Amino acid sequence: MTNIRKTHPLIKIINHSFIDLPAPSNISTWWNFGSLLGFCLVTQILTGLFLAMHYTSDTMTAFSSVTHICRDVNYGWLIRYMHANGASMFFICLFLHVGRGMYYGSYIYFETWNIGVILLFVVMATAFMGYVLPWGQMSFWGATVITNLLSAIPYIGTTLVEWIWGGFSVDKATLTRFFAFHFILPFIIAALAMIHLLFLHETGSNNPSGLISDSDKIPFHPYYTIKDILGVLLLILILMILVLFSPDFLGDPDNYTPANPLSTPPHIKPEWYFLFAYAILRSIPNKLGGVLALIFSILILMLFPLLHLSKQRSMMFRPLSQCMFWILVADLITLTWIGGQPVEYPYVIIGQFASILYFTIILLILPIISLIENKLLKW
């Protein structure tokens, strides 16, 4: 009798995706982040579901409902902080996952890569709307500032913003619709993640060398299932240290003040994972220019397959490109720091320089270095 794992229509799909999947024998820990992102998504959906059972999306009661969750609901504080810090872990894994793809040339599988970039956009939108829900000062003003950016769109901008707001300012209608979208989007993310995997399994995984690994494949289970479980345990450890010892470490103290449309916080800034994009937005004095730079700072990832001019796929054997890649990482860390600083000298100048460097490295320097490396190897 044939194993049910290989014959049952549904179990067969799971088998081909997670058990009998041929995987390269040399993929490193950098390949763990896909499974970690899956784990983060499941955790966020579950904690979010339990939070939604007690949350009310009304401007009068939203803030107090979050307080009620933390004070009166059994382990409500744990669920709330796991959800808030889980988002940070999600973005850490996302950035490392994208960075891995850039370093090892995974973007050559352009269908998988482009779905991944769309996923990044949707996750960022979801996180932004989630940040608005507690209805603290930073929630309200963050929503006001970011939605207001759409007014930079010529001709239809103002109408579009008022349509999104559901009125003439961020108010009850805005909060209610943001809650509705924040609830539905994670399920859309899950569907997109399945498409992401579908495209990946069409080609098979890349590996650190960037070479074709068809001649040396091993089954995903038990080798990489064990490896992924180790990664998940480490993620849980870091998340729980954060949640249990310093749950507000990555948050903003302003969000413990209920939203007040009459009082603007001294420094309006988003969560840490948006600061790099926020710094790019602020570094351009023109509103429309800033918005375009903000969108393009993420959309530029879609150009990576077109900008790949090297004869080698991975950066593993390309020291010049490696050096430039790490300068890009340092530049992004600088942008993240600048995004959290007030708009004054010298931060403005540093932000503008770092923003120019970000686009220059990706669009100009990396492709040129690739050509130089080809020349050095007489290719």
Swiss-Prot record:
InterPro entries: Cyt_b/b6_C (IPR005798), Cyt_b/b6_C_sf (IPR036150), Cyt_b/b6_N (IPR005797), Cytb/b6-like_sf (IPR027387), Cytochrome_b (IPR030689), Cytochrome_b_C_euk/bac (IPR048260), Cytochrome_b_N_euk/bac (IPR048259), Di-haem_cyt_TM (IPR016174). It comes from the Eukaryota. Binds 2 heme b groups non-covalently. Keywords: Electron transport, Heme, Iron, Membrane, Metal-binding, Mitochondrion, Mitochondrion inner membrane, Respiratory chain, Transmembrane, Transmembrane helix, Transport, Ubiquinone. Belongs to the cytochrome b family. Heme 1 (or BL or b562) is low-potential and absorbs at about 562 nm, and heme 2 (or BH or b566) is high-potential and absorbs at about 566 nm. This is Cytochrome b.
